[in-house]
Design a protein with these regions (language model features):
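Surface-exposed amphipathic alpha-helices with a cationic face
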Residues: 92-96, 149-160, 230, 302-306, ...
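Divalent metal-coordination and catalytic microenvironments
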Residues: 12, 17, 41, 49-52, ...
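Acidic, glycine-enriched loop/beta-strand segments at the rims
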Residues: 1-11, 24-27, 296, 324, ...
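Metal-associated gating/positioning segment near the N- to mid-region
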Residues: 39-99, 115-121, 147, 174-180, ...
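Divalent metal-dependent hydrolysis catalytic cores, especially in the metallo-beta-lactamase
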Residues: 67-87, 102-111, 131-144, 161-164, ...
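Metal-dependent enolase-superfamily TIM-barrel catalytic cores that perform enediolate-based chemistry
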Residues: 116-168
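Histidine-rich, glycine-flanked metal-binding segment
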Residues: 4-45
């Protein structure tokens, strides 16, 4: 995905999980005993990433395996876990060794929030402990005061671990930018930064991700925000699918609950999602027309990020309200194009951009020497972004997950739930 191009009549040779050769079908030679996967008329692209994933934060590995399967079945070959748990370190190791099937796993530690950080000193000690334990980064949730946040950020820089996630209301977007987030997720703090006098409001009044004050935004402030984000090299994980499917009035909760992908989730979970959306729509502050304008404002912010070279990463927040792991990544890609990105620009957010962000050149490209994380598609996603859903198979390093195998495993999940 380093260029917007299609290379016709290609053969890709994989050995021990790596691409060892690729080129014109008439010229590339390979062992006659090799397993041949017929991709005639199909399109091979790098595996996708879900950069705002949730792996169950529990002691039991079995629920984790189900979520990993859903990601892999949807062509997701890298995930960034945004709600860490001690057993996730073990899970990461078992995925790396091949003991457990799953995408490449980058994980945060347990959340830094208003409840988990009772003091500045406790927050600093949490940072040191998570760095020592081996987590890849720190996850920020709402509730931190600016003093506790400052202590956390200072210690994180001292010990060499990045932090990402929400922007606590008391911290605000400008302190967050100055502190040097690795990623800001959900466009958190963006709308507040556009609202004059936002300091006189409360988090509860504004609603989740400021959904109730979108009409107060002064869009002439957007260029200042974009410049600051670009200059500080702070990447964005919009999770627009969460807003479009949960907040938007035009998507009926019962209809969403009956979408085909919901059959792979526990019914209690889907019922909770349904009630969560219905309760939001009953909120006295909820105004359908205003929320539709808020959704359009979020799309504009995504478009402006892309236009102004603020790095974008693919992340939908799954599982979360009506976001089934893996499936929600395809929704997110579509919403990125709805925001004005081309299919190629949207695909970059889940491929080559991820490699740049993680400083791993093996992620997001198809070339000799890189890890074979690949997806075979029925059609060309550069002309129709919805083609990412039409998966013929997934190469997960040295494992080929055929369409037949994927369908069989998904059927098992369906029968369970």
């Amino acid at each position: 995905m380093d260029e917007e191009r299609v290379l016709p009549n290609q053969v890709v040779v994989i050995k021990n999980g790596k691409i060892v050769a690729m080129g014109d079908a008439q010229k590339i030679k390979y062992n006659k005993k090799a397993v041949v996967i017929d991709g005639k008329g199909k399109y091979l692209m790098p595996g996708l990433a879900e950069m705002h994933a949730h792996v169950p934060p529990v002691d039991d590995l079995e629920p984790m395996k189900e979520v990993l399967l859903l990601f892999a079945a949807n062509g997701v070959t890298t995930i960034r876990g945004m709600l860490g748990h001690p057993r996730h370190l073990e899970l990461r190791s078992k995925i790396q060794s091949g003991e457990i099937l799953g995408p490449r796993f980058v994980t945060s530690g347990p959340s830094f929030n208003g409840n988990s950080v009772p003091s500045e000193e406790a927050g600093a000690e949490m940072v040191r402990q998570q760095r020592k334990a081996g987590y890849d980064f720190l996850k920020i949730h709402p509730g931190l005061t600016k003093e506790k946040f400052a202590a956390m950020a200072k210690t994180a820089k001292e010990v060499g671990i990045s932090f990402a996630g929400h922007v606590p209301f008391d911290v605000g977007i400008w302190r967050a930018i100055d502190a040097g987030y690795a990623t800001i997720d959900h466009l958190d703090g963006f709308v507040e930064s556009l609202v004059p006098g936002v300091e006189n409001t409360t988090e509860q009044q504004n609603g989740l991700f400021a959904m109730f004050i979108g009409d107060m935004a002064d869009t002439t402030r957007i260029p200042k925000l974009m410049t600051a984000l670009r200059d500080k090299n702070i990447w964005q994980v919009p999770t627009q699918a969460l807003a479009e499917r949960w907040f938007a009035p035009g998507k009926d909760a019962d209809a969403l609950a009956n979408e085909p992908e919901m059959k792979y989730m526990d019914r209690k979970t889907v019922t909770n999602w349904t009630n969560t959306k219905k309760n939001l729509l009953k909120n006295a502050k909820y105004n359908a027309e205003a929320i539709n304008r808020y959704i359009l404002l979020r799309r504009k912010l995504i478009y402006e990020c892309n236009k102004n070279n603020v790095g974008l990463l693919l992340g939908s927040d799954g599982p979360q309200v009506f976001n089934v792991p893996g499936f929600s990544v395809h929704h997110e890609l579509k919403y990125l194009t709805d925001a004005g990105l081309t299919p190629y620009q949207a695909l970059r957010t889940g491929t080559v951009n991820v490699g740049k962000f993680l400083n791993n050149p093996e992620i997001g490209t198809i070339k000799k020497g890189v890890v074979a994380d690949l997806v075979l598609l029925r059609g060309n996603p550069l002309t129709n972004i919805n083609e990412t859903k039409n998966i013929e198979g997934v190469m997960l390093r040295n494992l080929w997950l055929s369409k037949k195998w994927i369908e069989k495993e998904l059927k098992k999940l369906e029968e369970k739930y």
